[in-house]
Amino acid sequence: MYKSYSMELAGRTLTVDIGRVAKQANGAALMHYGDTTVLSTATASKEPREGIDFFPLSVEYEEKMYAVGKIPGGFNKREGKASEHAILTSRVIDRPMRPLFPKDYRNDVTLVNMVMSVDPECNPEIPAMLGSSIATCISDIPFDGPCATTQVGLIDGEFVINPSLAQKELSDLQLTVASTREKVIMIEAGANEVPEDTMIEAIYKAHDVNQEIIRFIDKIVAECGKEKHLYASCAVPEELFEAIKKIVPPEEMEEAVFTDDKQTREENIREITARLQDAFADNEEWLAVLGEAVYQYQKKTVRKMILKDHKRPDGRQITQIRPLAAEVDIIPRVHGSAMFTRGQTQICTMTTLAPLSEAQRIDGLDEFETSKRYMHHYNFPSYSVGETKPSRGPGRREIGHGALAERALVPVLPSAEEFPYAIRTVSETFESNGSTSQASICASTMSLMAAGVPIRKPVAGISCGLVTGATDDDYIVLTDIQGLEDFFGDMDFKVAGTHDGITAIQMDIKIHGLTRQIVEEAIRRTKEAREYILTEVMEKCIAAPRDHVNKYAPKIVHIQIDPQKIGDVVGQRGKTINAIIERTGVQIDITDEGAVSICGVDQHGMDEAKKMIKTIATDFEAGQIFEGTVVSIKEFGAFVEFAPGKEGMVHISKISDHRINRVEDVLTLGDKVKVICMGKDKMGRMSFSIKDVPEEA
């Protein structure tokens, strides 16, 4: 049965159509926000997937180019693999939804959000996020929703709810907040050094709007929701836990996990698991879930140690940061490099500088984002965690971590006018034991400074964790979580920023939300830790950006030419400019306004290219002197090339002070000669003279 529901959201109408399309999906909602249209669907497999110990949720955000009236590029003119923006949006949708599914649910669930029309005033991410929640809530898939999502901007000191694409370009804050009925469940932000108090206020502005949306969703679910289907739980039998405790008492498990060395801990757990496998060799049912049982036993042990005893697995205090180290210039010949180590997490970041023409082109649905000059790429090889696995390129996690570090650093980068380079940083994970994304922010900051990029301020990142008890007041916030505390804890709250404010936030949780008290404490903790990392480690390693780029980095010079001369510089089919590039070894970019960028490593080549371009772009006058090459000899004279593709003729009578019968008696092909411009001949060609060049020239 088709029903339509509407509400006013941030001055625009949000309309949800139920039962109109995609009726064979478990749940579907056709979302309209202004003229933006997104189809959100939720489907689940009939049976659980065998042999897995995780919930198989897949979230897709599909950008259709017809939504903005474009035909996709490429040979086959079809949408290809998901763009980076689509992947990041999928992750933002996934993170608040995942904790609300049953932890022991093993049926495959797929959420698909298809962007069908884009109104620049209404960001399609909003209806996609809300549509996923609505489609799942009205379906028969087990789900403890709803959740709602709102975006907040900050323009001229005023908060803007669900800013348009144009407003986002002006905003000092791009914040996305998801909430359940009472608590915040997901935060994602990029900011221009927004103070902590302002950030908290913005988070709860969004949370208040989310409560209105949840009441709207409740009405839809009450009228259209299906009864949730029953499923076979894969929970570990309590009898198995009791049997394990008899073989491995709690004190032994505590001793196994209580070490500051990740590999020692993993070896301890392997030994315990092997003993249990031998003990339960005759019980196939228990063996099938033994891995999950040991995991749960570890988890309960670690959480009890932290929550009741305030004892962390590596012996640190609750607010203590792991040992830190920082170095720069560790890799030769790259344009900049730095390594940042935090405990058993180690990141090395390399910086590469290139002309602005190397900026990444973006062909997406956002008409305001067509390119970006700063790119941060994050790599996580299997050896960083002591595993062997083939490398298959960056996955969604790597793309997400790279984007987080990129977002954290963009606010402190110099403008293209101040520093006319495209910039790429690559963070290589050498070792991982938690918080590699935040370590990559620290390493990237120092690498940029070592490369001579004049960033305004250094940026550091830190992550806080959480362990909760039975009540909202029973919790412990942990500063600088390691891998084990992330796996067994309830939160990964990443915050990056400068001394003066926040530049990026990403919060993931595994429970049904955080109270305001926890959010405020986590943000306060990360500020204290960030100050320590910046002051005591990073700024002691490199205090300020170097005042020059690395000797191996390209240099860039700019000149301005008359826009009407661009065609002369480029030449027919690029012949002239390509000849300059080939001859001098530089890279040349010219804008429609006549701004010319010359980029190269060799200063002599850059000077030559600059001289050639200026020569070509000059209006020639009689009396100008050039140095050129004899490129052609005729009976009546010689042709001299004074710039790539530009020639003038020296008549035989203008070659020498005395009479000559043959040009070849004086000149040969390839001779370098100085000529003086005599004007233009009857055919409009440049007329040169060799004999009239002053001796002092």
Question: How should each PLM-predicted stretch be described?
Answer:
Residues G27-A29, C122-I141, V328-T351, N433-V453, ...:
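Conserved phosphate/anionic-ligand binding catalytic regions in large, soluble enzymes, centered on
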Residues Y33, A42-A44, Y61-E63, N113-S117, ...:
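Flexible glycine-/small-residue-rich
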Residues M1-A232:
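Long, basic N-terminal domains or extensions that often function
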Residues D140-D260, L448-D547:
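Mobile "lid/hinge" segments at catalytic clefts and subdomain interfaces of large enzymes
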